[in-house]
Amino acid sequence: MQKSLIAASVCAVLAALSMPSQACFTVVVGKDASSTGEILVGHNEDNDRRIITNQYWVPAATHKAGEMIEFEASAAKIPQVEKTFGFWWTQTLSPDGYSFSDGFINENGVVVVSNNCNVTIEEKETFNEGGIGYGIRRIVAERAKSARDGVNIAIDLQKKYGYFHMGRTYTIADRNEAWQIVLMRGHRYVARRVADNEVAFLANAISFDKLDFKDTKNVLASPDIIEHAIEKGAYKPAKAGDYSDFSFRKAYQPEARRVLPRNKERVFTLLEMLTGREYKDVNDYPAALVVEKKISPQQVQSFMRGHSKFEKRLSGWYHETMQDICNIGTFDSVVYQLGADPKLTVVWRSAGRPSEQLYTPSFPLAGPAAAQSYMDPATATLAQFHATAQQLDYSADRAIYTFLAAQNFIDWMPEERAKFENVQKAFEVQAFKDVGEARANAARLMKVSETKALDYMHGFNVRYYDAALGEAAKVVNAANTHAIAVTKDALSKSDAGTVDVVLFAAKDFDATKLDPKKTFFGSPYPDGSIELNKEMAKPAKVVFKDVDGDGLEDAVITFPVKGATALTVEGVLNELYLFTVVDGKPTAAFETVRITK
């Protein structure tokens, strides 16, 4: 009976996951568990379909009386405070507008990231005035003086407006402490402070198990959190009046959420990396562990690059599903070293999947390089839920697309992956040395002039970003050596016909040795379940003929338009990739095509 109930719950969870979803993975290392004595926060932002990440510095601001905060069209309108802090904003720009993906660190060194933990018993709870979603993270970034202050701000907003998403865990951290707070649809919440000697970890299921609700220094919760679970039939104490066996995650979330492969495998991968022990039981671990050996920032980077040993990888691509910590939907990865002086905080960021990108150091309070965005913060804020086609267009002048192209080639071409891993190791060894020296120099300058120190750190940010961009460009230049041509200037999503794609031959490249069974054409972005685009077009026909008159036979590959345009965005200039194998060697190329209705 228990197995059938779990199976039914799994079906319900999978049905929920068929909608556009956001996932993520987070690791928090307490300062006493950290080799640097700093709180470390690692976070992978995992999303579906076409996502463009940009980095902004939003300056501190003074606001007019009566100003209202408006984000999602249906959400509550919230009064703005007089003064807001400056913050680094990682935007995940989506055609549909994302409420739950952006990351922040403000001028006080307060970090905000989150993990989707939906499917809870609170699905029918109500909220006020449309409730709050995106506003939680943005308002905490704007107003929080500390991590604890950020938690209190989130709780106050939850009480007043209520959360409109079914469930999510926010990690809010600063140089002194790290908190994780679960917000559920309606007005209930549970927050837990990560102990200084712990490593906390979280995929996409509620992690809090048994909590000491009397320990109000480290645990904060809605007053009726246990009684409500009893009323809902989600919890029955073994002994009446004795709540010592109360497990928050078991009461408020179906076990099916934790046993989903995408959730359990990522947690098990992290646990094995931490302990050397193989885990199999989803109820056999706490929300955090005390570790014997201190954890370094480099180790947190390796955690965020974690891959499941059970992933089969049979499709030709390295990343296929969400069972890896670093997976097909990882659009942004960060590791924060939260310094005693927030201005000297270091963040390591990859502009995509961290196993296929470089972790690049920067001092976030000194601001990003101009090339890390292509809009100003005010325009980007307006675009958050109203992005135009032009704002989502591919452009070689937008640096983010070079990083995305590099990882697309690396993912399909094992030879490029092997070469890149050597570059990655050398780059990051040097980066740790350089950022240590830069941090020491900035601390010296800070004693003379804060402005000079910030200018120095901003220069470091720009140079290291440019260096990482240069390495990504080298990958693209080395891998993207074969020309393709899509024979239509635009493709319609409603077209039931076909389109020809020409793969041109060269003196050292025999296109007639193309393997049709290992050839695909379409969008490289993940689907709505954060898995490989399985709708990508396969050849309907392949003809070899000399298209360009150079005496060499080119491959003219006919693809169904429906598959070629799957997961593309209407009105947008999309990049479409040809993934194939020629003479036994994985090969890829791309062209841009405007997609119409």
Each model region followed by its residue ranges:
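A contiguous strand-loop segment
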Residues: C24-G133, I153-K280, P286-A288, E292
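Short, surface-exposed alpha-helix to beta-strand junction/turn motifs within ectodomains of secreted
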Residues: A511-M536
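N-terminal signal peptide c-region/cleavage motif recognized by signal peptidases
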Residues: S18-P20
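Histidine-centered catalytic/metal-binding microenvironments
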Residues: W412-A479
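Acidic, glycine-anchored loop motifs typical of Ca2+
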Residues: G528, V543-F559, T565, G571
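Substrate-recognition/cap regions that form aromatic- and gly/pro-loop-enriched pockets
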Residues: K312-A440
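A short beta-turn/strand-edge loop motif at beta-sheet boundaries
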Residues: S494-D495, K507-D515
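Boundary/junction segments of secreted and surface-exposed precursor proteins
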Residues: A23, A479-F504
